[in-house]
Each structure stands twice: as C-alpha cells, then as structure tokens.
Amino acid sequence: MGFFRLQNIKLINNVFKADCIKKMKLIETESIDMILCDLPYGHTQNKWDSIIPLDILWKEYERIIKPNGAIVLTSSGMFTAELMLSNPKLFKYKIIWEKSKATNFLNAKKQPLRKYEEICVFYKKQPTYNPQMSMGVPYNKGTRKNQLTGSYGDFLPVEVKSEGARYPNDIIYFKTAESEGKVYHPTQKPIELGRYLVKTYTNLGDTVLDNTCGSGSFLISALLEGRNFIGIEKDEDSNRFKADSVSYVEISKKRIKEAYLTLDSESKERITLYKSKLFKER
C-alpha cells in the first residue's frame, strides 16, 4: 500500500482542470512513483496539440518523481527525437508500440502507412521493473560450455533451459482504443497499453500521474491495476473531432467511475481509504 504525504491527499484519485505546470507545483517533492503521459506531439494545428515547453516540464517532473520512479512518455516522429534530446541524462530506452491499425492514409501514395508509436522511458535510478512475461514453448538446450573470451567477460558452464516463460522485448502489440469501445479523444490511447506499462513500472498502491490525461485512459489503467492516480487536463479548445464542444475532465471522471464499479470489494476499499469524492457511489 502506498503512503501519501499530507500535501498530496487532496490530489489523489481525482482529475483536475488546470494548466499542468501550475498544478504540478502543488504536488509534493519526490512523491510520485510513475509519470505515465501522452503528451501533445505537435503534429497538428489543433490548439490542444501544442507542445508543452519541455525545459519547464522537466523541472517539475524531476522534482516530483521519486528517485527510483519511472517517467514513461508516449511519442512519435520528430517529437520522439525532441523528447529524447530534451533530457539525455535521464533517457534510458524506447519501447515500440505496434498498433492494430495504421494511420497516415492521406499520404499513402507518397509514404508508408504508420503503424507504430514510441514510448520513451526516463529515470534517475533503476525503477521498479516487473517484466510482463509471455509463454512460449519450453526448451532445454543442455549445458553451455565455458566461454572465456566473450565481450562481457568469462562465463562458466550453465544449463540452458526454460519452462516456457519469455521476457518481454522492446516491441509490444496492443489494439488501438476503438477496440475497447467508444473513442472520446482524437489521440486516445488504449487502456490495455496503459495497464501493461503500469504493471511493469509500479507496484500495488503506488501513485501514477498523467498530467495531460485527455479522456482518462491511463488513469483507468492505474485504477484497474490497484494503483492510485492524479489526472490533470487543461481542457482548452476541446472539440471532439471538430464537432461539439466537450469537457475531457468530465468525460474522464465518468469513465473512471464506470471502471470503479467493475472492481471487486477489496479493490474498492483500497481506493476509498483516501475518501476521494470521485468514488462516492450513489
């Protein structure tokens, strides 16, 4: 079970309409276990897709993340390069998210369709890492001989076998958001992608921040995996697919409440320990 400092109590398990830089200043130093965020990429002319100044963002990120916390940010194209170079000291590696549906059909006769996005992982010290194992065919290749001239030093004889469990690699496949139901946001990420990342980089009861939470998918991911969350969304100039004006904060809250109702009683009790108004059942 995570431990909350007094300053964060009013923020935990809620979604706030605010400028994320200003709101993050209210979060206590070194109190967040994971930042999981789908930042604006700056790929469109929409006001909500404007890139947040990364130097200012990193100042707050580095202040609020725990020394062994993970900062996990989705990205694509040139924004990936900008993101990596914005903090080379903390950047560690990328994960490729292979999507079920491609994009870029307007340029299909000029360029390949785009079927992946990237996930950039940053941290100060080695964070929690729970590799999400998959199952393959068991094998036993016998005993490996001495290897005394390898690039990584000498190896003694060892039996090479597996019961079938396979460690994850840096390419992961998840269906896009429409496979999970209604899509509320133009860049909505799938809840299952978020659950995979939350399980990988946090433990039960930890706190996850999404400072540009959109329609709340990553917050739901945290909730379903027994983690606490803080969501921030500016909610500025929000028109769903250039149609009716919407409030993504209200959409997030509605989706989170619906997800909360699917939890078992033990999971609900874990959340309501912190008396979040968001989870009051009627």
Residue ranges: model-predicted function:
Residues 2-232, 236-245, 249:
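Core catalytic lobe of class I
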